[in-house]
Amino acid sequence: QSCTMAGIVNAGFATPSDGVNFFFVFSGMQIGPYQLAGNLVLAPMAGVTDAAFRVICLRHGAAYAVGEMAASGSHLLHTEMTRRRYTCDPRERFAVVQILGADPAEMANAAALAQECGAAMVDVNFGCPARVVCGKACGSAVMRDPKLAGDILRAVASAVTIPVSVKMRTGWDEDMKTSVEIAKMAQDAGFCLVTVHGRTRAQRFTGTVNRIDIAEVVRAVQIPVIANGDVTTPGEALEMMRQTQAAGVMIGRGACGNPWLFSRTQALIDGKPDPGAPT
């Protein structure tokens, strides 16, 4: 399990109207045996990132797309909805299954199932802020318990031979920010990638994304970090990368109805003109 940035440095830039200064980024990512051409990722969104939408975003320039979170509870693994979320579309060259749970053994079994179903990478959900999820001590609620988080990360990494990643928030609330600690645990467990949404669970989707907190995670680990939160334009994506020095950007709600946001932003990262939205 390994993940490194591609060795070629390209100039990433935005147009003057975007208000982003010139800066340098690595173009592309290598995750295990997979060389990915871009730096932009479709975020997992329940009820949105089904196979059809993932393929649309991949065709419009996303490096990879994360499926809807899949439950890890043994009593749920054989339900139709859960099995569908573990299923990888053959059109996805690099399929990613995200698993959700609070029991290390069940999460390990879920990771193994994802690999059996054809996933190229398993992503662990420590980021979902939904009340029904956190009420079961899952999603971002795990960030209140770094010991449990570490146990889950180690169990998942030990259960599969494919790359593993984790998506998290900056912490539970302003008084309990554990993203740096958990990112270090992920790195030590053998995870290849960390994605950070720049809000606490308490914020949910309100308030301002804290790019300083994301940058602290970037500085704390040697594995690539993907930045996430409130990216709806190419300029915002490039500014996120500039301010955080993240390896890439994960785009969620900004891609809904706007999948060409990926190709437009990646063109700028690669030093090419913005092709613009279709007319």
Where does each model-flagged region fall?
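Residues marking helix boundaries in flexible regions
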Residues: 6-9
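Short hydrophobic alpha-helical segments enriched in small aliphatic residues
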Residues: 11-14
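Flavin-dependent oxidoreductase catalytic cores
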Residues: 18-279
